[in-house]
């Protein structure tokens, strides 16, 4: 029993250790991309191309519609941002069944939508992405409140405000795309004074903040792009294994408890020394059967547990009279 318990404890420790290692690995591999401020002053939207990103599975991206306050410059821009297919992105059109990711219609607060690039979403309405596949985000609004619900054209056509997300792909394979558009860590452009060009034009950025586009550690991103899916598979396997172990332990405990209830606590045998003196007639000459009186209660008083509990409620003890053939064991004595 002690050995089995120690084995179970070791299995639990191994599973928890494996889960912790996988969690740390997944967290260390995931990157929070530089946020995208959705407005016409964002110079990252290149004419005829838009904004090209190379996110990996596990990364996160924030799309923000900045608010208007006392420090802002210009007017608030109203947009509805959609995720569409390639044909819609090329023609700058949306369909009625498309659901907006962002509804930028609150000038007094930031409106943000966070995209988590994951292959499997725990949310029913969550976004799911596949490696080596392209995804598109556009807006057909024109920036004014009256043109908020436009279904074609808009800033997608006039200002190339659209995002191409090449999930799980390497920016180096796209030739000079790294020099003309942002990747996982967009490089700083000339003339930004050390600030990222995706900074909102309405909010003054912190002068001390800067983004390094040459951070190390991104060369092996495509080799381990599916570590989150691997982590999810191993984690689910460990959880199923733990549930099976718990179920088996519970069933074993129930079986033992039931077995204890139905099995006798002691193996008792009738002692012939407790038998009453047999009745014998004067003319049987050892040929007639003897009347042996066997008490229901044995010497150790555990032969009938139920009788022990309730016998006092029913009066005198009850005896069973059994007919037995004549015998002469060593511990039975006859009256002469």
UniProtKB/Swiss-Prot annotation:
A GO BP entry: positive regulation of aorta morphogenesis
Glycosylation site residues: 39, 142
Cytoplasmic side: 254-336
SS bonds (residue pairs): 65-104, 92-156
Residues with the Phosphoserine modification: 263
Entry GO MF terms: ephrin receptor binding; signaling receptor binding
Ranges per topology, Extracellular: 29-232
Signal sequence extent: 1-28
Keywords (A to Z) from UniProt: Angiogenesis, Cell junction, Cell membrane, Developmental protein, Differentiation, Disulfide bond, Glycoprotein, Membrane, Methylation, Neurogenesis, Phosphoprotein, Signal, Transmembrane, Transmembrane helix
Membrane topology: Single-pass type I membrane protein
UniProt-recorded name of the protein: Ephrin-B2
Organism: Mus musculus (Mouse)
Gene (name only): Efnb2
């Amino acid at each position: 029993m002690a050995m089995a318990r120690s084995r179970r404890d070791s299995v639990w420790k191994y599973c928890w250790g494996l889960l912790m290692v996988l969690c740390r690995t997944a967290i260390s591999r995931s990157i929070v991309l530089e946020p995208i401020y959705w407005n016409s002053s964002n110079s990252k939207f290149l004419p005829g191309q838009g904004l090209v990103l190379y996110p990996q599975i596990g990364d996160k991206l924030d799309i923000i519609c900045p608010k208007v306050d006392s420090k802002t410059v210009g007017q608030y821009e109203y947009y509805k941002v959609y995720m569409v297919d390639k044909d819609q992105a090329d023609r700058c059109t949306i369909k009625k069944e498309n659901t907006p990711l962002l509804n930028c219609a609150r000038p007094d607060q930031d409106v943000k939508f966070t995209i988590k690039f994951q292959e499997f979403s725990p949310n029913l309405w969550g976004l799911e992405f596949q490696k080596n596949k392209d995804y598109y985000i556009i807006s057909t609004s024109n920036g004014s409140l009256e043109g908020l619900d436009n279904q074609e054209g808009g800033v997608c056509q006039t200002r190339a405000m659209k995002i191409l997300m090449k999930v799980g792909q390497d920016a180096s394979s796209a030739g000079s795309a790294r020099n003309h558009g942002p990747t996982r860590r967009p490089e700083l452009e000339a003339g930004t004074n050390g600030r990222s060009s995706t900074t909102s034009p309405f909010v003054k950025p912190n002068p001390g903040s800067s983004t390094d586009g040459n951070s190390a550690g991104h060369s092996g991103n495509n080799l381990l792009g599916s570590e989150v899916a691997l982590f999810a598979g191993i984690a689910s396997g460990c959880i199923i294994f733990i549930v099976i172990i718990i179920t088996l332990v519970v069933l074993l405990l129930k079986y033992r408890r039931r077995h204890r209830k139905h099995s006798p606590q002691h193996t008792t045998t009738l002692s012939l020394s407790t038998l009453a003196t047999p009745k014998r007639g004067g003319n049987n000459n050892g040929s007639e059967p003897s009347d042996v009186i066997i008490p229901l209660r044995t010497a150790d008083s555990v032969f009938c547990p139920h009788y022990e509990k309730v016998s006092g409620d029913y009066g005198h003890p009850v005896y069973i009279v059994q007919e037995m053939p004549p015998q002469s064991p060593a511990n039975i004595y006859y009256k002469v």
